[in-house]
């Protein structure tokens, strides 16, 4: 169970970090365009 939890956390971070990074860039781009 612990391994599954760690794998879930690792996967979540692996997905969320790049997504958040792209989201920040997108927001900045929209703000500059507007």
Curated annotation (Swiss-Prot):
Transmembrane regions: 5-25
UniProt keyword annotations, A-Z: Chloroplast, Membrane, Photosynthesis, Photosystem II, Plastid, Reaction center, Thylakoid, Transmembrane, Transmembrane helix
Superkingdom classification of source: Eukaryota
One GO process term, biological-process aspect: photosynthesis, light reaction
Keyword Plastid: yes
Pfam families linked: PsbM
Keyword 4Fe-4S: no
Membrane topology summary: Single-pass membrane protein
GO CC entries: chloroplast thylakoid membrane; photosystem II
Subcellular location: Plastid, Chloroplast thylakoid membrane
Function: One of the components of the core complex of photosystem II (PSII). PSII is a light-driven water:plastoquinone oxidoreductase that uses light energy to abstract electrons from H(2)O, generating O(2) and a proton gradient subsequently used for ATP formation. It consists of a core antenna complex that captures photons, and an electron transfer chain that converts photonic excitation into a charge separation. This subunit is found at the monomer-monomer interface.
Family from the record: Belongs to the PsbM family.
Subunit and interaction comment: PSII is composed of 1 copy each of membrane proteins PsbA, PsbB, PsbC, PsbD, PsbE, PsbF, PsbH, PsbI, PsbJ, PsbK, PsbL, PsbM, PsbT, PsbX, PsbY, PsbZ, Psb30/Ycf12, at least 3 peripheral proteins of the oxygen-evolving complex and a large number of cofactors. It forms dimeric complexes.
Protein name in UniProt: Photosystem II reaction center protein M
Organism: Morus indica
Organism placement in taxonomy: Eukaryota, Viridiplantae, Streptophyta, Embryophyta, Tracheophyta
């Amino acid at each position: 169970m612990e391994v599954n939890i760690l794998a879930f956390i690792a996967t979540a971070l692996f997905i969320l970090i790049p997504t958040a990074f792209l989201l920040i860039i997108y927001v900045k781009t929209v703000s500059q365009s507007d």
